[in-house]
Amino acid sequence: METLPIELGLLISRYTGINEITKYRTCSKNSKKYVEDVLTWFDVKCNNKVFGGLNMFANVRKLDLQECRCITNESLSALTNIETINLRSCYRITDNGLEYLSNIKEINLSGCYEITDSGLRNLNKAVFVDISNCPQITVKGIVKFGKNASIVIDNCPLIKSKHVNLLIDIELVKITRNNHPFLSYKPRHIYEKSTNNHIMTHQTKIDKPKFNIDDLKFSSDSSDSDLDAISDVSYVVGEVSDDDNSDSGSDSSSDSSDDNSDSSDDSSGKNTSKSTITKTQKATVEYANDYISKRINSKRKILFDKIYYHPINKRDDIFMKNYEDLLPNDQLNSRQESLNRLFEDKDRKNFTENLKNKSLDILIGGSMGLYCVYKNTNFKPNDIDLYIKDINLHKIKKIENAIYKSFLFDRIVVVNSPITITWYLQLKSGKITSIQLNKFNIKSWAEMFITYHTDLTCIGYEIITDRFVYMKKRWDRILTKNKHYFSCILNLDTASSIRRSCHKYAERGFNCVCINTDFKKYNQKSESDDPFYDDDDDDEPRKKKIHKKKYPKVINQLMISYYGIEEAPSSLPNRAGSLGNILDDDNFVNTLINKYKGIKNISFSSSIRHFKMEKFFPDIMMMCLYKVNKYMKYPDSSNGTEFHQFSIEKKKTYIEKTKKFFDISRSETKISHESLKIKCLECCCYIYLNHLISKYYSNIHHKFSARRDSDSSDFDDPYDSDTEYNLVCKHMLRSFSKKNHKDRCLVLSVI
């Protein structure tokens, strides 16, 4: 090829794979020089498999290395002549690496959080610089560029808006948005998962894959799990458009493809109830699943960035909209009809009014908001999900007091997990209901709704303003889309929990698709099917781990270090995610025990115990694979993926107080039985356990009120062979028999 004219060589290179070109480069010295000359005519994009060795791109003019997290300072030493480079999320790049880029004209350093003002001094010739998400850059760093360079400074905490406005007024800097055709953020497509490490722009224009119904015919030996996965992701590729910014256009165009795909899926599903998929069909579905996941992932992160870019006091005004703005609509109830649904239960209405009287800025979210405003619902939620701004102990006690004033119940169970407090109530009618308070330290509703795994539930009732609000660019999409995606992009839910939620809403009449990282449906018989399962350095036999559900190692480390707890609870084991009507007291308590048996800090009490908490609440936000204020690196990750599971201020005093937040309180609490409306509290007995549900039981702490006449002879030997649980049951039964109580006031409380 060296003897061919350069024009003909370029034409051949456009239709040749990059692997073939690089292989030809190794043939001889002449071929090496020829390939390097040819590459100067291409804009080269690299995928995240690049580990270094950029010498062959020494003469390339434009190079895209975004999210190539293994690129180091040494890798840039061969790029001294490059003019345009994209280093977005290459977090290993430091100020030393920028010394090799002194001739650069356009550069994207977004997410390179090791860069400081000193490193920017090397970019003297730059006319476009994106330093978004660089927490160490100050105003001094951007002033050096002058007004001849365009600077992008989104989400730089050390650059205050008042300083930037002043510099703009006196024309010292030129601030802009990143609309650069080569350096702006564009999510990587599925074809970049090929074995090639480098991709040339001129060769990568590939149409969306077109799925044919005939390609997804199965043989007669199919498993239900595989068929479920196929039905989830077979025809979703056309759902999302290429343009991330054209929301309305993509929605309308995707609906038509949804209708066609749904009808095709229904027609083929009748004849494929017993079949298996081939390797080609499986690869096709993996292709589709990964493609749609990347698109949704990209849009969600962009929206997340926009939320945290704005000041706290403006986030709800920008991203939360009044539900009445969508009216009239054939799919939605009027405001009065929505309120009638919300207050159709008298106890719920009283509870809402009591919260409003206490001036608590609370939002009722979850499925309750969807049920109230959406006409075509075939379900009635039996639980209430609460979110509160600026959470503290005083506000939680107000909520608890409102529960006692609003509901008349026979049994109550208080479960305090690391991220929620749940009150399970067994009412006088026998009905079971639950009230769950999320302990996220949020300042706006937008911060909470961005973590939801589906657009369906991004609506709620704001009590203090007496209106329904929804998240813009999320919930309003359900009015134009026929398919609803469930994903764990910015939350800590396991794949199995996401799939259960997906099935729950599918049973409620919605067309739902679960987007998982793995092709296989989660199966409890195989932990490897769950992408969140981690069995590294675990000598426990496989048989004992069959039903364990673990979160990623980095989450477990945080839970153990900061909260003293090994595993957080997920959804209830049943698909509906609801307790239902459990009239039997034993079943009511045992069901909750089975749900929370993975938590050690559980205690039984014979009366309602006001949980004692520290005033300092951990700043918890369920964020995965993205950052809020700081980066938290996953040390065992092969590709350097960054995690920010919990936004916690890393101060020693704060950590100590956070630990105390989840420690068990061993002080006796006096209960005023007149205010709790529970018949069984007449005995006023009190039993406290340090640990209840665990493999081995340790000490028993017996604390009884003065009204109970205890006999020392009734106490069992603490070294009795019975388990701690059995000992407590014996003591409780004896106390009840003395007072002739028919009911067992057994109450569970996680401290």
Curated annotation (Swiss-Prot):
A GO biological-process term: SCF-dependent proteasomal ubiquitin-dependent protein catabolic process
Keyword GTP-binding among UniProt keywords: no
Biased composition (Acidic residues): 256-265, 529-539
Domain F-box: 1-44
Gene Ontology cellular-component terms listed: SCF ubiquitin ligase complex
Per-repeat ranges for LRR: 79-104, 105-126, 129-148
Gene3D superfamilies xrefs: Ribonuclease Inhibitor
Annotated region described as Disordered, given as residue ranges: 239-278, 527-546
Keywords, in A-Z order: Leucine-rich repeat, Repeat
Protein name (Swiss-Prot/TrEMBL): Putative F-box/LRR-repeat protein R753
Pfam family, one: LRR_6
UniProt xrefs under InterPro entries: Leu-rich_rpt, Leu-rich_rpt_Cys-con_subtyp, LRR_dom_sf
